[in-house]
A protein has these predicted regions:
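Claisen-condensing/thiolase-fold acyl-transfer catalytic domains that form or cleave C-C bonds
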Residues: 1-55
Length: 55
């Protein structure tokens, strides 16, 4: 994340996915790029990822 990550993002408990996706979408618009990848640790050895494509 070129604009900071982890604690630097600042978000309420349970809002991690929403804030990461929102920031990724804003970054797609700002830079004019086509793809963004959002990954997140869920704890307990789990993780999730989402690939976004701007159309």
């Amino acid at each position: 994340n070129p604009n900071g990550g982890a604690i630097a993002l600042g978000h309420p408990l349970g809002g991690t996915g929403a804030i990461l996706l929102t920031k990724a979408l804003h970054e797609l618009e700002r830079t004019g790029t086509e793809h963004a990848l959002v990954t997140m640790c869920c704890g307990g050895g789990l993780g999730t990822g989402t690939l976004l494509r701007r159309v």
